[in-house]
């Protein structure tokens, strides 16, 4: 349970590195901590840790979607929340997949894993997220 709460917290830190907050060290801290958690867990557990990380990341990072649906789309409060949560949950599947693939493909060479494999997996999944099913490039 503690691991999942830390993963959620790490996800909440990530968007704080971007506008309007611009506290860029939080992004580095977020990624460092989530990599630590992924290493600590099993391959199956890595997906869940990544998914929960995504819930925090997307929950804070795209909170404007709720505003658009509720206020500009004139949808009810509960319906807007449910739709936004489903959207965030689906986007979090990509961060779960990133964590799973990293854990699955990880070697014993830490330099190769952290400097090459993780960034390549992260960017590849980001490209997939940007185009698959019409994409969401945010």
PLM regions: where:
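Membrane-embedded alpha-helical bundles of multi-pass enzymes
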Residues: 1-138
